[in-house]
């Protein structure tokens, strides 16, 4: 329900929201996910060094939901957003996100996200 609600609010397909989160969080058990509530590999500030002695460049969120909302807000600030808003094509969205530099390995990331979307019938 969260991905569907965010999809309606932000115009980003739920399949893309879920596909990226599944890949970036290793379906939930990743360290970023567990310690930072970060399901999307978004870089930013955190307090893990101070609280646990762990140095990381990834952003910390108060809740899982906050991570999902931040991903959607991040998409609204991308150049491609106006032309793709409310477009249901996962392929076009993933290609645009990849091309915009979301990942350090865009071609591999794109393949993996699209594969995740297909594999989970999103």
Where are the language model's segments positioned?
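Catalytic cores of secreted/periplasmic lytic hydrolases that degrade extracellular macromolecules
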Residues: 1-122
């Amino acid at each position: 329900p969260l991905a569907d609600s965010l999809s309606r609010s932000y115009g980003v397909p739920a399949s893309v929201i879920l596909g990226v989160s599944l890949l970036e969080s290793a379906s939930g058990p990743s360290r970023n996910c567990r310690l930072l509530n970060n399901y999307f590999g978004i870089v930013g500030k955190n307090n893990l060094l101070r609280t646990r002695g762990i140095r990381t460049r990834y952003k910390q969120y108060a809740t899982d939901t906050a991570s999902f909302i931040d991903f959607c807000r991040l998409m609204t600030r991308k150049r491609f957003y106006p032309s793709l808003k409310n477009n249901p094509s996962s392929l076009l969205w993933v290609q645009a996100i990849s091309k915009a530099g979301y990942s350090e390995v865009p071609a591999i990331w794109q393949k993996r996200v699209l594969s995740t979307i297909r594999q989970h019938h999103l």
